[in-house]
Amino acid sequence: MEKPPVQHGAVCGPWDMKDRLGTGGFGNVCLYQNRETGELKAIKSCRLELSMKNKERWCQEIQIMKRLNHPNVVKACEVPPEMDFLVNDVPHLAMEYCAGGDLRKLLNKPENCCGLKESQVLNLMSDIGSGIQYLHEKRIIHRDLKPENIVLQECNGKTVHKIIDLGYAKDLDQGSLCTSFVGTLQYLAPELFENKPYSVTVDYWSFGTMVFECIAGFRPFLHNMQPFTWHEKIKKKDHKHIYAYEEMSGEIRFSSYLPQPNNLCSIIVDKIETWLQLLLNWDPIQRGGGMDCGRPQCFVLMDQILNLKIVHILNMTSAKIHSFHLQPEESLHTLQSRIETETGISTCNQELLLEMGVSLDPRKPASQCVIDGVKGWDSYMVYLFDKSKTVYEGPFQSRSLSECLNYIVQDSKVQLPIPQLRKVWAEAVHYVSGLKEDYSRLFQGQRAAMLSLLRFNTNLTKMKNTMVSASQQLGAKLQFFKRSIEIDLERYSDQMAYGISSEKMLRAWKEMEDKAVCFGKAGKIHFLDETIMGLHTEIVELQKSPCARRQGDVMEHLEQRAMELYKQLKPRSPDKAYSDSTEMVKILVQTVQGQDRVLKELFGHLSKLLGCKQKIIDLLPQIEMTVNNIKEADSSLMQMQAKRQREIWHLLKIACTQSSARSLGPASVETPITPRTSAWPDQSSSQALFSMLTTKDKSREILRHTIDKNSDYQKLLSSLILQTQTTMEQNSLMSLDFSWLNK
C-alpha cells in the first residue's frame, strides 16, 4: 500500500516526528520517537518519483544495511508497523539514531576552522578505517565517503563515528555516476571522474581526503576550485604530493607535507604524511600501498600510528610541549635522560607530575605516563618541574605569528579578497584559541602542583601528628619518672639512718634525674609545631587565592568574538567583496595582552606553591630526626626506669633479709632483728571480729570459715619469718652482692 510522504510533525500511531535530520538526492531522513517507550529511530523515506534504476538502488541499500553489523557502520532496524508502507513505490528504511549529528556539522564549527584536535583526528581514523575494512571484507565499496555520510554517537563517554548512506554501493550503475554525485564530487577518486574501472581503492582516496580536511580544515587539492577544474591540474602531481594550493600569482604549488597550522604533534605529523601519501596516490593500482601480510599497507600503517605510545610533557619552566615516542618496556630513567637532552633539566632535578598531582614511580616503566585508550596530546599531559627552582619567571614569549597573520598585524587596514581573508581569519581564530589553550594547559600544570603540595601537606600533617603524639607520651613518662624518682630519693633519705645506704646507688639515681632533664629537651617541639602551623595557614591562603582558580574569562570572551567575526565573514560572497582586518587585529592584540597578564599571575602563584612545597621538603627530615630523637629518649628513659625498679626490688629483698637482724640492735645493720612472730590478730582480736560479725547477723558457718582461714595465713607467715631468720644467720649485709648497681 502506498501513502504520501510523511510531513513534519506528523504522527504514525505511537510514533511522533521530532526533527528532520537530513535531505539527500532522493530522500529525507527524519527522527521519530515512540510516545509510549521513548525509543528513537531515524526513518529514511523517498521524497521523489524514482526511475526503475533508482528504485533498485533504494531497495539495494535496504538489503545491504540489513545484513551489516559493525560498531562503525550505522545499523538498520525494523520499520515500525505503522510506517510499513510504500512511499513513491519504495519502502522506508529504519536506522539507529545517532544524536551527535554528522561530521560536516562538526567541521563547520568556527573552532575547527583549522582542523580538529589530535584526539578527534585519531579517533576518526580508527573508527572510519575499521568501518571501511569491514565493508570491503563484505565485498562492498561505499564510493561516497564524505563528512556528510559520517555520523557521531556518544557511547560510554566516547565519540563513535559511523558510516551511513550506502545508496551508491558497488553494484550501482556506473554510467550515471557523474550526474548522481552532483554536489559531492570533491571527495571522489579520479577514476570515477574518468569513468574507468575501479576497485576498493576509490574509498581510500575519499578516506584520505576526508582525514586531510579534518586535520587542516580544508580539502587537500585546490579546495576553492570546482572539481572538474582541479582534476586537470592535480593529475600531474607526484605520488608523494598530498597538498596543492594556488599562489597569489595563480601558480599551483604542490607539497608532500601537511599545511600549518594544525593540531597534531610532530611525531604524528610525520607518520600521517607518509600514510596520506599512500591514500592520495593518483594511480588507483598503487593507491593504498599494496598488500602487507594479507592486508592493504595503508591499514597496517594506520594501525601502527594508532598504536604509538607517545608521552606529551609540558615543561613548566618554559611552557613548551615535548613529545616522546616510547619504546616497548622503556624505563622511566631512559625517558628522563631523553628529557634532559631536550630541556637541559638534569634527571635528578626533574619532577614529573600527572594531572592529579601524583609523581611518577621510578620503579615502573615509562608507559605509566600514557593512559590506555586515550590518544592525542590534547587529552592528557605530564607536567615537568625543575626541583632546583622555586621561582618561575614567566610569562614566556607568546606563539609566533604566521606569515599571513604578521601581514595583517603590520597593516590591519589592508583590503583583501574574501577567500584570502577567510584563510587569514581562520588562522587568527586558531591563534587566539591557541593562546587560550596554552594558558589552560599551564593552569592545569599549576593545579597539578597544588595537588602535589596538598599531598605533601597531608604527609606533613601525619608526621606532625606522630611527632606530637610521641612528644606527649615522652612528656607524660618524664613527668612520671621525675615524680617517682623524687619520692624514691626522699624515702631513701628517710631510711638511711636505720636502714640501707649506698653512695654508688644514690649517685646513679641522681645521674638518672639529670639525664631525664636532657631527655626532656628532645620532646621540645614548639618551634617545629609553630612552623608547621604557619605552613598550614600559608597553604590555606594559597587555596583561597583568586589565582588558584581559572583567570581566562577575558581570553575566552575574545575567542568567542574572533569566532563571531569569522562566522560573519564566511557567508559573504567571494566575488564582490573586499575587507580589512582591523577588528580581528584588535582581538589578536588584546588576547596577547590578556595572556601576558594572566600568566604573570599564574607564575607568581606557582612560585609561591613551589616555595611552600620546598619548605615542607626541608621540614620533613627535621621532623623525622625529632621523632627519632624522641623515640631514643623514650627508650632510654624506659631503660632507666626499669633499672631503678630492679634496684628497688633488690633493696626490698635486702630489707626483708635485714629485718630479722634488727633484734640485735637498732644501730647495727648486720645484727638480725627478731620480729614478732604474731603478725596477725591475737585471741582478743578474733573475739572482736566474732562479735562484729555476729552483730551483723552473719551465719556461723561463714564466721568459722573466716577464722580458720585467718589461722592458716598466720601459720604461713610465721613459717616464712622463721625461714628468713635462718637465712640471716648464714649471711651478713656486708657479704651481699651489689654488682647490680653497675648494670
UniProtKB/Swiss-Prot annotation:
It is an enzyme of class 2 (transferase). It comes from the Eukaryota. Residues 15-300 form the Protein kinase domain. Activated when phosphorylated and inactivated when dephosphorylated. It is found in: Cytoplasm; Nucleus. Keywords: ATP-binding, Cytoplasm, Kinase, Nucleotide-binding, Nucleus, Phosphoprotein, Serine/threonine-protein kinase, Transferase. It holds the Pfam family Pkinase. Its main location: cytoplasm. One of its GO terms (molecular function) is IkappaB kinase activity. It catalyses: L-seryl-[I-kappa-B protein] + ATP = O-phospho-L-seryl-[I-kappa-B protein] + ADP + H(+). Its EC number is 2.7.11.10. Residues 736-741 are annotated as: NEMO-binding. CDD domains: Ubl_IKKA_like. ATP binds at L21, G22, T23, G24, G25, F26, G27, N28, V29, K44. Residues 453-474 are annotated as: Leucine-zipper. InterPro entries: IKBKB_SDD, IKBKB_SDD_sf, IKK, Kinase-like_dom_sf, Prot_kinase_dom, Ser/Thr_kinase_AS. The active site is at D144. One of its GO terms (biological process) is cellular response to tumor necrosis factor. Phosphorylates inhibitors of NF-kappa-B thus leading to the dissociation of the inhibitor/NF-kappa-B complex and ultimately the degradation of the inhibitor. Phosphorylates 'Ser-10' of histone H3 at NF-kappa-B-regulated promoters during inflammatory responses triggered by cytokines. Belongs to the protein kinase superfamily. Ser/Thr protein kinase family. I-kappa-B kinase subfamily. This is Inhibitor of nuclear factor kappa-B kinase subunit alpha. The lineage of its organism: Eukaryota, Metazoa, Chordata, Craniata, Vertebrata.
